[in-house]
């Protein structure tokens, strides 16, 4: 039975079992937001603990990870949706499989001292287009809203522009209101001007990480608080898939194709239940 199988043995079609080792594990790359998931995946497949496999998950972020795949320096990418121009490059080459495997949510966070507990999707859009500028307009204190954004090309920024703004042009943020990293953005919202003026976004996976979420409050959107259940049920409004991507010519018996099939199969990872 399964108990006798070595760690990480996965079905490779038919009755064949394939055992992943450090020697045959495909080179992984991806987004900041999928790195925790990839670490959990490596731990399961290699039968090692999370600390041991951390060195195998050295992710170069969404845009760069797809470029690495196209350049041949990564075998399998687990990432947020690529920015439109990167997607165009992938599709132009016609040789990359890009398949959704899990859903994540874009969540909005404020300093925990901010009395506002929720916004509507429309209010969020109006804040980011500059139509709503003060927290008092959405039931909060008389305080200017400081809406942070991520850098262009970041997975969460692409998701923000697609699922939140729906084509509306966000205002050009001052340089001090953008952050080049997820951690930087959360720190900014936590500490900006020692006040509760800031608003920012991250993915559910990160907002669920206790260390990351320290001092922050996640807002309900349209009355729905993001939770694993609300994401799975599709009730929370700001959802987007994560993708797994490989070379479509990877042979059926290659570790890359076997891992791709495993990610998409019933044993594969889901984001709605963060590990640990």
Locate predicted features:
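Exported/periplasmic ABC-transporter solute-binding proteins
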Residues: 1-276
């Amino acid at each position: 039975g399964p108990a006798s199988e070595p760690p990480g043995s996965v079905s490779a079609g038919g009755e064949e079992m394939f055992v992943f080792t450090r020697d045959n594990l495909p080179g992984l790359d991806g987004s900041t937001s999928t790195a925790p998931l990839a670490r959990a995946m490596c731990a399961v497949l290699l039968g090692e603990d999370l600390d041991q496999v951390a060195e195998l998950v050295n992710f170069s972020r969404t845009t760069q990870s797809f470029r690495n795949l196209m350049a041949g320096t990564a075998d399998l990418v687990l990432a947020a949706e690529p920015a439109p121009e990167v997607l165009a490059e992938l599709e132009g080459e016609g040789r990359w499989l890009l398949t959704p495997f899990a859903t994540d949510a874009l969540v909005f966070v404020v300093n925990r001292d901010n009395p506002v507990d929720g916004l509507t999707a429309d209010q969020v859009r109006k804040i980011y287009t500059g139509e709503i500028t003060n927290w008092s307009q959405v039931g909060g204190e008389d305080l200017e809203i400081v809406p942070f954004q991520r850098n262009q090309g970041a997975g969460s920024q692409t998701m923000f522009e697609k699922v939140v703004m729906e084509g509306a042009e966000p205002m050009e943020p001052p340089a001090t209101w953008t952050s080049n990293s997820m951690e930087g953005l959360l720190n900014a919202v936590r500490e900006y001007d020692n006040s509760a003026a800031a608003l920012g976004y991250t993915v559910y996976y990160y907002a669920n990480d206790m260390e990351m979420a320290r001092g922050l409050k996640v807002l309900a959107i349209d009355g729905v608080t993001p939770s694993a259940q609300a994401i799975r049920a599709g009730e929370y409004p700001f959802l987007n898939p994560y993708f797994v991507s490989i070379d479509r010519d990877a042979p059926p018996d290659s570790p890359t194709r076997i891992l791709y099939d495993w990610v998409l199969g019933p044993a594969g990872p889901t984001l709605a239940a963060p590990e640990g």
